[in-house]
Amino acid sequence: QQKGGKEGASGMNTPDELKALHEKCDAFADQIDEITNRRNASRRVAELVYKISKAQGYSEHDALLYYLVGLIYDIGFLNIDPVILRSEHITEEQFNVIKTHTSIGTNMVFFIDEKNRGLFKDGVSKHHENLDGSGYPAGLKGDEIPYIARVLRVAETYIALVSSRDYKSIKDRDSALRELYEQKSQYDQDIVKTLDDIV
């Protein structure tokens, strides 16, 4: 049983609608990964989000939508100076600029159909919220954070931990999972356990 309920789209999409949406999100994913210098990271996150949500009992339709949100959750980076995004050492001021990608991105999902826009906004704006309220931008806690944002938080962190771009040393699967388990105040442990089962 999922915390916060099984929220999905307000209506079903036709296969053609999903295909068109997929093409748009796919194109943005390429741009996001290029500007952040994170090769194929968006798709890797999206694939984990899909697998986790399916394993947790979500429908194929909703899991596909979550996959699409996973492709563009960092879309706000497209309006941030790439020099900052690619810096190895960032200042506090630069980090504050980077943090604005959540609010910037929320205003960039206008191309999403109205019935799904709320879901995409939740993923884009809230994927850096932590269960204990220590995240940003709103400091949401627990069930205030929608499922799509909680699953993105886990998937994004795992991919970052096992990738060389975000950390000086690449962690192996077990080390990355251990870190997610240890930081239980931040990450939904039901989602972490499901991740553990599928990777």
Predicted regions and their residues:
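Histidine- and acidic-residue-rich, metal-dependent catalytic cores
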Residues: 13-199
